C-alpha cells in the first residue's frame, strides 16, 4: 500500500480477508446494537408513560372494580403496572369465587399473583440488555484479534524485504489497527447504553415493587373493614 494513501476506506480494502471479515462482523454487530438501543429507548419511554398514567388513575379515587374492568378491556394497551394490578385483582376474585374468606389467604394469593406478573414484566423490560452487555464486553477483543492477525500478516509480508522502514511498516500496522478502532466503536455506545438502561430499569422495578406493596396494603385494609372486600369499595 502507498504510505500516502491511508484513508479508512483504503485501509479496509487493503486488509487481509480475515481482518476484513472481523471488520464486517463488528460493523454488523454495531448496527444491531444501535437498533437494540433505539428500540429499548422507546420501549422504556412507553413503559414509564403508561405506568405514570395508570398510577394517576389509581390514586384518583376510581374504584378498584372500575380500574380492573378498564384493565381487562384494554389489556393489549395496558402498561406493566396496570397488568400487575389486574393479575392481583384477578386472583383475588378467583379466590372469592371459591368462597375463600380468610383475609390472609386472599391477600397472599393476590400478592403472589402480582409478584409473578411483576417478574414476567421485568423479563420483557430487560430483554436485549444481555445483548448490549455482550457487545460491550466482547467487541474490543474481537477487534484486538483482527489487529493481531493483521499485524502478523503485515510482518509476514516484510520477511522478503531487505530494508524495512517506517514508510513500509506504517500502512500494514494501520490497517490492522482499524479493526481495534471498529471494535471500540461498537463497544463504547453499547456499554454506555447498557449502564443507562440498567439504571432506568432498576427505577422501574423499584416503582412497580412499591406499587405492589401499596396495593397489598389497600387490600389488607379493605379486607379488614369491608364485608365485600376491595371489589365493593374504593381506596
Residue ranges: model-predicted function:
Residues 1-56:
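Hydrophobic membrane-targeting segments
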Residues 13, 17, 23, 127-130, ...:
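Internal alpha-helical transmembrane segments of multi-pass membrane proteins, especially GPCRs
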Residues 27-47, 144, 151, 186-201:
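Alpha-helical transmembrane segments
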Residues 49-142, 149-165, 192-235:
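Predominantly long cytosolic amphipathic alpha-helical stalk/bundle segments
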Residues 162-176:
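Hydrophobic alpha-helical transmembrane segments and adjacent short intramembrane/lumenal linkers
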Residues 176-190:
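Hydrophobic alpha-helical transmembrane segments of polytopic membrane proteins
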Amino acid at each position: 500500500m502507498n504510505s500516502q494513501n491511508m484513508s479508512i476506506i483504503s485501509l479496509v480494502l487493503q486488509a487481509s480477508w480475515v481482518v476484513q471479515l472481523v471488520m464486517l462482523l463488528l460493523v454488523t454487530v454495531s448496527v444491531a446494537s444501535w437498533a437494540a438501543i433505539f428500540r429499548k429507548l422507546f420501549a422504556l419511554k412507553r413503559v414509564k408513560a403508561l405506568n405514570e398514567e395508570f398510577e394517576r388513575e389509581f390514586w384518583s379515587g376510581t374504584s378498584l372494580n372500575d380500574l380492573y374492568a378498564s384493565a381487562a378491556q384494554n389489556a393489549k394497551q395496558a402498561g406493566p403496572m396496570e397488568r400487575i394490578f389486574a393479575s392481583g385483582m384477578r386472583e383475588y376474585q378467583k379466590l372469592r369465587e371459591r368462597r375463600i374468606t380468610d383475609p390472609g389467604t386472599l391477600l397472599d394469593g393476590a400478592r403472589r399473583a402480582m409478584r409473578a406478573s411483576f417478574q414476567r414484566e421485568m423479563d420483557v423490560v430487560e430483554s436485549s440488555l444481555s445483548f448490549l452487555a455482550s457487545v460491550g464486553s466482547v467487541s474490543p477483543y474481537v477487534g484486538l484479534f483482527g489487529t493481531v492477525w493483521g499485524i502478523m500478516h503485515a510482518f509476514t509480508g516484510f520477511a522478503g524485504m531487505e530494508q524495512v522502514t517506517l514508510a513500509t511498516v506504517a500502512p500494514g500496522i494501520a490497517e490492522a489497527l482499524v479493526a481495534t478502532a471498529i471494535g471500540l466503536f461498537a463497544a463504547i455506545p453499547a456499554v454506555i447504553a447498557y449502564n443507562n438502561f440498567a439504571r432506568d430499569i432498576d427505577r422501574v422495578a423499584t416503582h412497580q415493587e412499591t406499587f405492589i406493596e401499596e396495593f397489598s396494603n389497600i387490600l389488607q385494609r379493605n379486607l379488614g373493614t369491608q364485608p365485600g372486600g376491595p371489589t365493593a369499595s374504593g381506596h
